[in-house]
Amino acid sequence: MMASLRKLGGLLALMAPALAALAQTPLATYEGADRMERIVAAAKKEGTLTLYTTIAEKDLPTLIKPFEDKYGIKVKVWRAGTDKVLQRALAEAAANRNEVDAVHFGSPEMEALAREKVLQPVTSPVYKLLQPGSVPPHHQWAATLLSVWVQAYNTKVVKKEDLPKTYQDLLDPKWKGKLGIEAKNQDWFQSVVEIVGGGDKGLKFFSDLVAKNGISPRTGHTLLTNMVVSGEVPLALTVYNYMPEQAKKKGAPIDWFALEPAVARSNAIGVARKAPHPAAALLFHEFMLTDAQTLMVSLDYVPTNTSVPSPLKGVRIMLTDPIRSLDEAEKWSKLFDDTVIKKAGR
């Protein structure tokens, strides 16, 4: 009996440092069985969090209110375009003005924040449920949704049976003067260059397309979607899947299809390294990857959590690499402008 107690005592002595270390582990990387209990308790004490995001204004209540109702934690939202969110987060970090708790916008921009040490690493069990490529090795952000570029058409101008089946079909003369594109979609352009042959062959595809059929560039996906609805742009090459779907549900003469593989970029959630309300930010991070995933589907977004059915189930998707997008942004922006935008008469 005494020998057994001595063995138990020795075992506990060996375990003590590990247990102590676990108890002192920051919540963001804590992996104990009571992880969520700790996060929720600490978050409720903080009572609030500030979110910087690019999520559409009309979609925010659908995503934010359920979180507030479930946990009794108020979310203060500052919403702006991608560039403004990035600039504000970087400027405040540089000035050591720590106001933001969580950030949600494009993954390439999230990677830029990570490189400037604005975000903190997070370890979460939900990561294993996310689509491949959703979490970078440094764990400083996690993709929540995919913005999938699809093709939208005016149903009064274009017949469904006439739609192109492949990217190469866009070279058919029947599309002359009917194509539109968003003027800043170099990520889509980069991916399709690879899809249709890569390198000079891929670039030649776009040069031929512009020369033969022309492409009308428009700034803003919402504007491009509206121009499809009006019939001014019969076929748009790059709108996000949820935009024509939402317009269609309201009775607009628009529908969409996907040339495969469809190209997608991800939006992601990150927790600020110096968040004033770190636990609340972490809880919101978990919420966006779990409960909010079905809410995103209700808004026609494509979720990254593979346990949630996708509105684009069955469509082959090619996910852009956010790190490559960031590192090669200047190169592909120039190629896109030189090959498509400038030659399109912009």
Question: What do the PLM-derived regions correspond to, one by one?
Answer:
Residues 310-346:
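Extracellular/periplasmic bilobal clamshell ligand-binding domains
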